[in-house]
Amino acid sequence: VKILLLTRYDRLGASSRLRSLQYLPYFQSLNWQVDQEPLFSQAYLCNLYAAQSTWKDVLLAYMRRFKALTRVGRYDLIWIEKEILPFFPAVAERLLKTRRIPYVVDYDDALFHRYDLHRLWPVRAVLGRKIDNVMRHASLVVAGNQYLADRARGAGARRVEIVPTVIDLDRYPAPVPRSEAADRPLVVGWIGTPKTSCYLHPLKSVFASL
């Protein structure tokens, strides 16, 4: 089996690392060939997290993605994280359907609201139903939770499976019970990004109570 994995990021991106890349050793053990092509580079994320200009990185990212699309015919399956080209109509996904190349699409958050709830009406008008179209034509939609799965089913997806975002317990083993580590501070790991860490702020009181 030959799979082209079109991730959003490389390993520095939490969603790509936890939704697909951590499973690659397992697929390799099945003798599956999985070729990863990230959209955004490590340099892009480093610049983004440092609040530096990223427009050159974005331009290069789209050029790399267009180049990757010229090779889709070599694969049995295309595995897409979220969408092929952000803020573009679903032309690339329709191309796969036209060429009868099956694709699986994975969502770990409500990306569709980036378009259908966008503050600018032209974006809502042109891209508001984009993700629904991507879901509808996918051979499989992998959803991180029930909300995403319901959206996929409502969009007419043929098959939907819920796979929550999890961590690899070989890398992050179960902690020592608190009763055995009362003299040590509680350490909470954040698997998100600096850009999304703001969502932790409303939970300060919860962490303090621990």
Regions found by a protein language model. Give the residues of each.
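Acceptor-binding helix/loop patch of EC 2.4 sugar-transfer enzymes
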Residues: 40-52, 103-132, 168-173, 182-184, ...
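Helix N-cap/beta->alpha junction signal
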Residues: 82, 145-146
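An aromatic- and histidine-rich active-site surface loop
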Residues: 8, 78-100, 105-106, 191, ...
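Conserved catalytic-core segment of nucleotide-activated headgroup transferases in glycan assembly
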Residues: 11-26, 30, 35-36, 168-172, ...
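Short hydrophobic "strand-cap" motifs at the C-terminus of beta-strands
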Residues: 6, 144, 188-192
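Membrane-proximal helix-turn-helix segments that form the acceptor-binding/catalytic region
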Residues: 63-74, 87-105, 111-112, 121-141
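Carbohydrate-associated surface elements
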Residues: 147, 166
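N-terminal strand-loop element at the rim of the active site
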Residues: 5-75
